């Protein structure tokens, strides 16, 4: 027996009627979108404002070996974009705003750029920006090589094959395990490009002593900390981590159209 509902009537009403009026062994609920336009829900939507991206084409859609759900979508307004675990990471139309603000936030506090470390940043934008800023050497610690590969394939303008540059050394796997073997006072700049959720905040806080150890005196650590407009408590949590470990932090801000909000970067100098 099939029961079809549409419009503003809640499917739960139909389910209740079926359960009460018809003897059954099981019920299967299916939903489909009759629209000709594919929409992708924006995780940063609020209860009072539901937003979605218009998708022209799905270019990639898979789960990586390390467990991340990776998608490359061709968006109507922003071009090709990387989504990880259902959240936009970068879009080719405005990635330069993100990466340039990220790197320059650190350089404002200390212009030295002999050697940098990048933690995360699988799309390659931060690595490309460091190369364009003429950093001498760049150690890029990335958990998931499949993110890098799929971005090289579909978003090559962002990374510009950064992994193939002589100045870049890629270290695959858990970054915080890998940096245990790095010598003290190695880096002028450290860029932490992890997710801005509480898990990554706690992870960074747990390993901050190691990050301080490998940062040169007067060196700078910069992290992307999310949107102060959308998630102020989350940004405050990041700032607390930096203030507790460095006694200082400076917040930078740039509007990212594909994120539909201003994004923040926190930088601290190692006094």
Indicate residue ranges for each PLM-predicted region.
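The AdoMet/dcAdoMet-binding core of the Class I SAM-like
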Residues: 3-42, 90-245, 259-261
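Non-catalytic substrate-recognition/targeting regions of SAM-dependent transferases
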Residues: 2, 20-84
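Short beta-strand elements
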Residues: 249-250
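Core SAM-dependent methyltransferase catalytic element
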Residues: 245, 255-271
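Short, glycine-/Ser/Thr-/acidic-enriched flexible segments
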Residues: 77, 228, 256
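Residues at the C-termini of beta-strands that transition into short coil/loop
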Residues: 76, 174, 253
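Active-site lining segments that contact anionic ligands and/or coordinate catalytic metals
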Residues: 67, 79, 218, 262-263
């Amino acid at each position: 027996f099939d029961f079809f509902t549409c419009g503003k009537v809640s499917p739960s009403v139909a389910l209740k009627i079926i359960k009460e009026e018809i003897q059954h062994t099981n019920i299967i609920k299916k939903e489909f979108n009759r629209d000709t336009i594919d929409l992708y829900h924006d995780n940063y939507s609020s209860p009072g404002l539901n937003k979605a991206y218009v998708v022209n084409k799905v270019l990639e859609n898979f789960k990586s070996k390390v467990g991340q759900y990776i998608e490359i979508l061709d968006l109507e307004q922003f071009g090709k974009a990387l989504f990880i675990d259902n959240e936009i990471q970068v879009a080719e139309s405005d990635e330069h705003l993100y990466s340039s603000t990220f790197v320059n936030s650190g350089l404002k506090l200390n212009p030295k750029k002999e050697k940098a470390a990048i933690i995360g940043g699988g799309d390659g934008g931060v690595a490309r920006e460091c190369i364009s800023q003429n950093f001498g050497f760049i150690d890029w610690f990335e958990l998931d090589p499949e993110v890098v590969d799929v971005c090289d394939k579909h978003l090559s303008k962002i990374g510009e094959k950064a992994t193939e540059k002589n100045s870049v050394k890629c270290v695959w796997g858990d970054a915080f395990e890998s940096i245990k073997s790095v010598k003290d006072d190695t880096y002028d700049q450290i860029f932490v490009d992890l997710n801005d959720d509480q898990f990554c905040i706690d992870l960074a806080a747990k390993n901050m002593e190691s990050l301080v150890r490998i940062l040169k005196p007067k060196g700078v650590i910069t992290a992307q900390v999310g949107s102060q407009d959308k998630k102020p408590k989350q940004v405050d949590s990041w700032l607390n981590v930096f203030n507790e470990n460095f006694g200082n932090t400076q917040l930078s801000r740039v509007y990212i159209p594909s994120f539909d909000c201003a994004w923040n970067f926190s930088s601290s100098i190692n006094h």
